[in-house]
């Protein structure tokens, strides 16, 4: 019998497992793929065992090595891409670099332990990098005889989530055992199916990139005699059409306005360019020296130039090619946003004297030129052209 072909009509959602080491994230990932393969067999739903997920391949994202396992599966309603990272450092890097863009996550907490230090850290990181929807899976309930103890652990988790501005009282908490489900215990398999129903219902469908406001980072600029100035780059999000009014934002204090008079891709004229396309846009009324690499072309009013922001950053270790020594307050590296480097100074949090290679920390940054940034914009920190850190804007300050 022919395998059914990949069904693009199902909404696609990115999720992941987060939580403290050894609380069962990878076992749960294996259980989800295995139970779905048993209950909803399809070409997509293939069982993955613990070992294959745990042997996550190394990837490089903006100069940083990260181990990440990607599995896919589907429910009756949706297609999921699921990210699981084996080590704690891999999670931190994944989230801060934006390598793992999760629409929602399953927070795994062992009922035998309750919340632990990394549970807290992963909740904080989720809050910082904009993962808005968490579902709790209390794992290993088969090892706890005392019903009251389970209630206490659940209360503790809910309080912790509320502390970081998640709706701790209202978000779903599912109690089960990933290992028992993996072993084929039907009671615990049912709970995995209940978990997936909850993920279907509770984590909203993400807004498609093409529905977001236009953002096109300018990579190159040239002029075509008799026609005007062309800016080229890859459309980050949104759509650009001929006759659109746009704004040119960043590097300079003032925002310039222009009208798109042509869109082309691979030297062919288009009516519109979509998120992901590499395009050249012809701009009316803009001189060759009025637009430069590092600026962005954006939907009017959608993004502004800023010089001050808070960021959550990960600093590379020496082994990853980063610094060999710590840095201190007023460290002045380059911040690489999309297509350009801008010098900026770093202010450390009160009470933090220095930042060591391998640390993650919240910093205040002040750039020497304004750049088009918003909450969620990612950046690299560089010194003399080599990457020494990676970060994400968590709050705009000026």
Swiss-Prot record:
GTP hydrolase that promotes the GTP-dependent binding of aminoacyl-tRNA to the A-site of ribosomes during protein biosynthesis. Residues 139-142 are annotated as: G4. One of its GO terms (cellular component) is cytosol. Its main location: cytoplasm. Monomer. Mg(2+) binds at residue 26. Keywords: Cytoplasm, Elongation factor, GTP-binding, Hydrolase, Magnesium, Metal-binding, Nucleotide-binding, Protein biosynthesis. The gene is tuf. Belongs to the TRAFAC class translation factor GTPase superfamily. Classic translation factor GTPase family. EF-Tu/EF-1A subfamily. Residues 63-67 are annotated as: G2. It comes from Streptococcus sanguinis (strain SK36). Its EC number is 3.6.5.3. Residues 84-87 are annotated as: G3. The keyword Metal-binding applies. It catalyses: GTP + H2O = GDP + phosphate + H(+). CDD domains: EF_Tu, EFTU_II, EFTU_III. Residues 19-26 are annotated as: G1. PANTHER family: ELONGATION FACTOR TU, MITOCHONDRIAL (PTHR43721:SF22), ELONGATION FACTOR TU-RELATED (PTHR43721). This is Elongation factor Tu.
